[in-house]
Amino acid sequence: MVRGRIFRLSVRDVRFPTSLGGHGSDAMHTDPDYSAAYVVIETDAEDGIKGCGITFTLGKGTEVVVCAVNALAHHVLNKDLKDIVGDFRGFYRQLTSDGQPRWIGPEKGVVHLATAAVLNAVWDLWAKQEGKPVWKLLVDMDPRTLVSCIDFRYITDVLTEEDALEILQKGQVGKKEREKQMLAQGYPAYTTSCAWLGYSDDTLKQLCAQALKDGWTRFKVKVGADLQDDVRRCQIIRDMIGLEKTLMMDANQRWDVPEAVEWMSKLAKFKPLWIEEPTSPDDILGHATISKALVPLGIGIATGEQCHNRVIFKQLLQAKALQFLQIDSCRLGSVNENLSVLLMAKKFEIPVCPHAGGVGLCELVQHLIIFDYISVSASLENRMCEYVDHLHEHFKYPVMIQRASYMPPKDPGYSTEMKEESVKKHQYPDGEVWKKLLAAQEN
């Protein structure tokens, strides 16, 4: 039962120095420090349950997201949780329509990252109070309640409330069987952990060999900085995994449109399933042009991790600009906005393969994609969820991978709660880890 009035919202800048090991490095982001604006909301309920939410960043700039969270905090404080979730669409609209901070969005950029962090904390709190993981909270909701969580503004030309309700009602058929399947087998995953751009060939080979031993069959390699380097690294991986296993490529927005087509034409011999983020995430027509050129070569287009909002996804789908849609649990406006994108993807019959490279993203997005299979898509064809083997040890309820699949979380909440010791050690700039690193830089 939903209970309590929110009386406190705190937000901290938490950073992990992943750049020291080249983890997360790609053609555009060469030295990321995986980071998060970490939000905790507390209520006056006697149970003492806290809601925890994050949005993912790469180090510098996290302090700006923290400021944006604080600018939105008044929308949450002194609100009864039952009033928020009882009119979740209205609350989402309130957060995203605040006239002054909206000007530095709207529904994109720093202010939308902050919105995601706040809403992720609300979903975590709600699910904890209900005693369910978020995926189960969603699966158990009746279709009308799910639809009531979604803001359909700007997407009714593609998805109306009636469309969404029809999709969800159809998804009720076979739902119990699919839930049992997920609990037994998990949701298929792919690994990005082997082939960050900053890794040496020896590291790449070592990690790839270990991944094969661990049962991984789907691999992603970062490309885009140097063509000959890409050819060499892709050859190493393809030789190791063989042609029977799946290979994807990710350029992280490095190329112009003609360059993307030319570059990928030269990498086509390695038989990638997709090229991810070949150009600017805002260039819908550019993605459509690249798609038209590469699909005949057997290469699909995947994008979405830096798509600002549901409107960009709507246009990508309308323009036939992608073959694989990549939601992000912290870029979009939390569960609410992701629901609208999952439903649009279903309407266009485009598989959803979430982005999960980053601190806490695996923990969050597993809930969304498991719900998608059970209640929306009812398909695993050409579907998989990214997995990155970094920083899970800092979470109270870390993701569980078995047989290269995400096993559905059983603990209540959104799996967003971090260990307090980890937060204190990695808080920027006053945590123990950063005091040492910053002192060393000064010397």
UniProtKB/Swiss-Prot annotation:
Q: Which transformation does this protein catalyse, written as a reaction?
A: L-fuconate = 2-dehydro-3-deoxy-L-fuconate + H2O
Q: Which residues form the active site?
A: 222 (proton donor/acceptor), 355
Which CDD domains does the annotation name?
rTSbeta_L-fuconate_dehydratase
Q: Please describe the post-translational modifications of this protein.
A: Could be sumoylated.
- Membrane-spanning intervals of the chain: none
Family annotation (PANTHER family):
ENOLASE SUPERFAMILY, MANDELATE RACEMASE, MITOCHONDRIAL ENOLASE SUPERFAMILY MEMBER 1
Q: What does this protein do?
A: Plays a role in the catabolism of L-fucose, a sugar that is part of the carbohydrates that are attached to cellular glycoproteins. Catalyzes the dehydration of L-fuconate to 2-keto-3-deoxy-L-fuconate by the abstraction of the 2-proton to generate an enediolate intermediate that is stabilized by the magnesium ion. May down-regulate thymidylate synthase activity, possibly already at the RNA level, by promoting the degradation of TYMS mRNA via an antisense RNA-based mechanism.
Designated name of the protein: Mitochondrial enolase superfamily member 1
